[in-house]
From Swiss-Prot:
CDD domains: YlxS_C. The keyword Iron-sulfur does not apply. This is Ribosome maturation factor RimP. It is found in: Cytoplasm. Gene3D superfamilies: Ribosome maturation factor RimP, C-terminal domain, RimP-like superfamily, N-terminal. One of its GO terms (biological process) is ribosomal small subunit assembly. Pfam families: DUF150_C, RimP_N. Keywords: Cytoplasm, Ribosome biogenesis.
Length: 152
């Protein structure tokens, strides 16, 4: 996790949790002049638009005061959704047995993209099975990971 992301997590997670929600994760995507700060929230029973609104108002107020991002950005607050992103070892462990798509920051064994069965975690590694081969991917090397929804 980058230091900017760690700073944003430390600043915003207490705000989200203080409102009674779980801070599922935070993404900061900087693309030239257009940057996006995404806060994913969750709670028992699911998230409503009003929940996102409440978190957005509080997060905006804190971000305006603390000003951790010097450039312009768009703030988005949403539920993790069906294809929920995975950020922590605990989240990977709790979704063992599901199909995932993982993108790494840099190639591992000649590839950056892995799609397969999430087997779980071992220490600081995420274990994913692609076809009949298991890969142990260091959590710090993962750029993006999402559950692949099953419509069985």
């Amino acid at each position: 996790m980058s230091s900017k992301l760690e700073q944003l997590q430390a600043l915003l997670a207490p705000v989200v949790e203080g409102l009674g929600y779980q801070c599922w994760g935070i993404e900061y995507v900087s693309q030239g002049k257009h940057s996006v700060l995404r806060i994913y929230i969750d709670k028992e029973g699911g998230i409503l638009v009003e929940d996102c609104e409440a978190v957005s108002r509080q997060a905006s107020a804190i971000l305006d005061v603390e000003d951790p991002i010097s450039s312009e950005y768009t703030l988005e607050v949403s539920s993790p959704g069906m294809d929920r992103p995975l950020f922590t070892l605990e989240q990977f462990a709790s979704h063992a047995g599901e199909q995932v798509k993982i993108k790494l920051r840099s190639p591992f064994e000649g590839r950056r993209n892995f799609q397969g069965l999430l087997r779980g975690v071992e220490e600081q590694d995420v274990v994913v099975q692609v076809d009949n081969q298991e890969f142990l991917l260091p959590i710090d090397s993962i750029d993006k990971a999402n559950i692949i929804p099953s419509f069985d």
